């Protein structure tokens, strides 16, 4: 359940993606810096906590998210809020050495972890990944540039979700999909209770061992402030997507939004 936080970050990248020629004014988003600090702080233990708290299930959920994206061999794809790189690595296996993966995150510490992990992997497809520090609500890419976009545990932490969805729509090619994995904000009281109980009695106590209790207490707050599956579908349609469907997975604890441009 650490993947539950949905973290992102930047480091020594394989290269900076050239900013497009369109003049785009950067806007400072309230609270984004505080969230960046939080994600930077947990970066060193993020992967270990993901495995421990989810009992390894986060790997299954991430594989599902990548499959729903429709990414295939030779594609140029984007992983937003890439964190330590799990989804980006899975995407690279889909697109192969003839494809390209961009992993973007606003946390430099998370990106540093991702770059280190990449350097230790032997498969040639992992060389097609490029890491870039950036903001999900102001993407440094051209219109209609990507064949697929993924986001794992990121939208919940974005201050302006509609703007982020509009940016994903903008950079996607027509007919392509975005796949967004995150905690599910359930309408079922039992599921909501169990989520809260797990965070209070499992996640936070384990995080306390790593001196990260306050950072992981944020998780419960962020889920409460997130959107239900139906609200996420509405958000995607409002952003311009032609269709959207939210899937509840892992007993309703997690959810995945799939939207088609």
Curated annotation (Swiss-Prot):
Main localization category: plastid
CC annotations in GO: chloroplast
Family of the protein in this entry: Belongs to the class I-like SAM-binding methyltransferase superfamily. MenG/UbiE family.
UniProt GO MF annotations: 2-phytyl-1,4-naphthoquinone methyltransferase activity
Protein purpose: Involved in the biosynthesis of phylloquinone (vitamin K1). Methyltransferase required for the conversion of 2-phytyl-1,4-beta-naphthoquinol to phylloquinol.
Domain of life: Eukaryota
HAMAP family registered for this protein in UniProt: MenG_phylloquinone_subfam, MenG_UbiE_methyltr
Annotated protein name in UniProt: 2-phytyl-1,4-beta-naphthoquinone methyltransferase, chloroplastic
Localization per record: Plastid, Chloroplast
Species per Swiss-Prot/TrEMBL record: Arabidopsis thaliana (Mouse-ear cress)
Transit peptide region: 1-30
A GO BP entry: methylation
Catalytic activities: demethylphylloquinol + S-adenosyl-L-methionine = phylloquinol + S-adenosyl-L-homocysteine + H(+)
Gene3D superfamilies in the cross-refs: Vaccinia Virus protein VP39
E.C. number(s) listed in UniProt: 2.1.1.329
Annotated keywords: Chloroplast, Methyltransferase, Plastid, S-adenosyl-L-methionine, Transferase, Transit peptide
Mutant phenotype after disruption: Lack of phylloquinone and reduced growth under normal light. Loss of anthocyanin accumulation under high light.
